[in-house]
Regions:
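Transmembrane and membrane-interface helices of multi-pass
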Residues: 1-36
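A general marker of short, structured functional hotspots
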Residues: 3, 41-45, 289, 382
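Alpha-helical transmembrane signal-anchor/signal-peptide segments
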Residues: 30-48
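Solvent-exposed soluble domains appended to multi-pass membrane proteins
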Residues: 52-64, 68-407
Length: 407
């Protein structure tokens, strides 16, 4: 009897562990919700997707350079409460001042930012959302895309638009380009010249055995390498798109550089953001002193909302509406429609082109709307909840046409 009891108890424990594991897996990847919605078909792309390949896009005679800086997990939430954020005192005061001094699109009447929507809440998806105005859907863990021969074969990104208009595209990141299929996407959609962790080793920017137990090399080096590259490419006769992706502020707790000043009233993760704000501010100040600056537009954005609250938003109410940082610097266009906007990652795609002085017939590309135009975004027109619900459903147009190019 005792052996039978132990035998049954073991199986009971196994069943409990399996059920707990399935519960955690579903909580992480929304498997049940995805299964539920994937049995429904959405026509959101048929109704609202504007094919950038067919759109009328006109560049000014004087083509402006673009420096596009994606900061890992940077939120408008990090502003001070008085300026529209959550913090009693801003943990990114320099970036708050940059947003104040330049063009910041806001969800309110103070400083603010934008939503990430389904398929853009992780770095690979965020890059695609920012540059192609569509989400990256599918793949457990959201980073299993290197297995595909191509990624979003029929998408038409800002990199492709710029390359087709005589620009040269560059992408610099401290991490490995192969993670999440980022390198493959950038090569196929804009033929970017990519500088990543492996490039830095191959070209002896860092030692072959360089290791700081992080995602790659640190942002201090990224900004130094970027300065060297910008000086070199600015001497060429072609306009450039130089895009960067930082890594120090990646969760969990970030990478606190040894050169950072530490505020003991802040957590380590808050100190990482505070130090990152100073580093980026210094980099922007350096750009503003360069000869190429007058003909260069700078865009600073967070890639997506922070995936964790530990060490940075632990005292935040569950219903707090977090937004992603944005600042547009040295523009050739003006607008009165910066405040009280409802917008998401997709809208940054046409808005960045407009910031360069590009004219877009209809003011929409893919699922994004040019914010400078004052035209309603899809978030404003349809509502965020409806938009996310439709993006979660199966789309024949997305799967067949956009992803696999069968259209």
């Amino acid at each position: 009897p005792l052996n039978k009891f132990i035998y049954k108890l073991r199986w009971l424990i196994v069943i409990i562990l399996v059920l707990f594991g399935l519960f955690k897996l579903n909580a992480s990847f929304s498997i049940m919700r995805s299964f539920q919605y994937n049995n429904n078909i959405s026509d959101i792309y048929e109704k609202y997707y504007v094919n950038p390949k067919k759109a009328q896009i006109n560049f000014p005679s004087n083509k402006r350079n673009l420096i596009y800086i994606m900061v890992e997990s940077l939120e408008a939430t990090d502003f001070s409460y008085n300026q529209g954020g959550f913090k009693y005192k801003s943990i990114i005061p320099e970036l708050e001042e940059i947003a104040n001094r330049n063009t910041n699109f806001s969800h309110g009447y103070k400083l603010g930012g934008f939503y990430d929507v389904l398929g853009t809440g992780f770095t690979a998806g965020a890059i695609i959302g920012h540059t192609s105005g569509i989400p990256l859907i599918g793949g457990i863990g959201n980073n299993n895309y290197n297995k595909y021969e191509s990624i979003l074969k029929n998408a038409y990104s800002i990199g492709e638009i710029l390359a087709d208009s005589g620009y040269k595209n560059y992408f610099m990141m401290g991490s490995d380009k192969n993670f999440g299929g980022r390198g493959k996407y950038l090569s196929l959609h804009g033929n970017y010249e990519i500088f990543d962790f492996n490039t830095a080793k191959d070209l002896n920017y860092i030692p072959k055995d360089y290791e700081i137990k992080w995602w790659g090399f640190e942002d201090k080096k990224l900004y130094q390498f970027a300065k060297e590259k910008l000086i070199k490419i600015s001497k060429k006769d072609e306009p450039f798109n130089f895009t960067m992706l930082t890594v120090d502020t990646h969760p969990i707790d970030g990478y606190l550089d040894e050169t950072c000043m530490v505020d003991n009233s802040l957590t380590q993760y808050e100190n990482v953001f505070a130090c990152g704000s100073k580093m980026l501010n210094e980099f922007i100040a350096w750009i503003e002193k360069q000869k190429f600056y007058d003909n260069t537009t700078i865009v600073i954005v967070g890639d997506h909302l922070n995936m964790i609250k530990k060490g940075i938003y632990e005292d935040m109410p569950q219903n707090y509406n977090r937004k992603i940082y944005n600042a547009f610097i040295n523009l050739s266009v003006n607008t009165k429609c910066t405040n009280n906007r409802e917008f998401n990652t997709f809208d940054i795609y046409p808005t960045t082109l407009a910031a360069l002085g590009v004219k877009i017939e209809g003011e929409r590309l893919a699922l994004g709307t040019n914010l400078f135009s004052c035209q309603d975004t899809l978030t404003e027109e349809l509502g965020l909840a409806y938009l996310n619900t439709e993006l979660l459903k199966k789309s024949n147009y997305y799967n067949n046409c956009l992803f696999f190019g069968k259209c």
